[in-house]
Amino acid sequence: MKPSLIEKLKTLTYRYSEIGGLLSDSTVINDQDRYRELGKEYAQLEPIVKCFQQFQQNEKAIESAEEMQQEKDPELRKLAEEELEQLTLKKEELEDQLKLLLVPKDPNDELNVFLEIRAGTGGNEAAIFAGDLFRMYARYAETKGWRVNIVSAHEGEHGGFKEVIARVIGEGVYSQLKFESGAHRVQRVPVTESQGRIHTSACTVAIMPEVDEIDQIKINPAELRIDTFRASGAGGQHVNRTDSAIRITHLPTGVVVECQDERSQHKNKARAMSLLQSKLLAAERAKQDQEQAAKRKSLVGSGDRSERIRTYNFPQGRVTDHRINLTLYQLDEVIEGDLDPVIGPLIRELQAEQLAELSGE
C-alpha cells in the first residue's frame, strides 16, 4: 500500500480517537446538533479504523513470520513459510477492503428519490414504453423492499404514460437507482404496427434525490404560482370530488410540479414543494457536474438526460448499456424488474474508477 494512503489512515485513526473523547464531553453532549454530527462522523470512520487495525496486526504477524524464517530448525522455517503465505494473502484482501472504504461516499446514497419518466420520440409507443419502464422499476423496488408512491401521472392514449413521477422510499434507494438517469431506447414491433416493422422509441428517466431539510434551497413564496385542480384517476390511488390536487410553478425557472396522490390539499402541497426542491437542487447539481466534467470524465456517464444510456432490443432479447459496453441477453428478466445484473456492473465500474483515482493520488 502506498505510503500516502497509510498516512491518511493514520490521520483518520487519530480523528476517530479524538471524536471518541469528544462524545463523552458534557459540553458536546449538551449540544445536540454537534453531538449528532460527531456521532455520524464517528460511525463513518469506525469500519475504516477497525479494518486498518486488522491490517496493522497482520503486518506485525508478517514481521514475526519473517523472523521465524531465520530459525535453524527446518520445521519452524516450514511453519513460518506456510504462515507467511496465508498472511500475505490476508494483507492483499485487507488492502483491497481499505481502498474501498477510503473511496468517498456519495452523500445522497441513502436518500429516497423522485423517479421521473417522460415519453420521448415515438408517440404512442414511447408512452407504452414509459409504462413498461415504470413497471420495471416498481417491480425492482418490490424486490428491494422499497415503497413506490405515484406523485403525478399523465396517461398515454393507448396505455402507458406520457409522464409519470413517483417517490421511491427505502434503504439505499439512490445508491442503486442513480445510474438510471438518461435516455432509454426501445426497439420492437409496436402493438399498433400491422406490417410487423420494428420501431425505435425513447423515454427519458431522471432520478432526483429527495431533498433533506439541511440541503433545501430557499424559495421565495412570491416567485411561486400555485394552482388547485381536481385529481384525476390516473394520478393517484384516490379520486377526489374536491380540488385537492396541486400544481406549483416556479416562475424564475419555469419548473412545474404537480401532486395529486394525497387526499388533502395540504399534504399535496407539501409533497409538491418537496418535489420542487428536489428538481431545483438536481438542476443546480447538474450545472456543477457539467462544470466538473471538463476536469474529470466519469466512466458511467454524467447522467445527462440527453445521453442515450441503454437500449432494450425485443426481437433479439437484448439489453445493452452503452456507458460500459455491457450486453445481456436477459431482456425478459430485466423488464420484469431484475435490474441487479445491469446495476451491479455499473456500481463496480464506478468503484474501479474511484479506486484508480485513489491509487494515483
Swiss-Prot record:
It is found in: Cytoplasm. Residues 286-306 are annotated as: Disordered. PANTHER family: LD18447P. Keywords: Cytoplasm, Methylation, Protein biosynthesis. The modification N5-methylglutamine is found at residue 237. One of its GO terms (cellular component) is cytoplasm. Its main location: cytoplasm. Methylated by PrmC. Methylation increases the termination efficiency of RF1. It comes from the Bacteria. SMART domains: PCRF. Gene3D superfamilies: 3.30.160.20, 3.30.70.1660, 6.10.140.1950. GO terms for molecular function: translation release factor activity, codon specific. InterPro entries: PCRF, Pep_chain_release_fac_I, Pep_chain_release_fac_I_sf, Prokaryotic/Mito_RF, RF-1. This is Peptide chain release factor 1. Peptide chain release factor 1 directs the termination of translation in response to the peptide chain termination codons UAG and UAA. The gene is prfA. Belongs to the prokaryotic/mitochondrial release factor family. The keyword Cytoplasm applies.
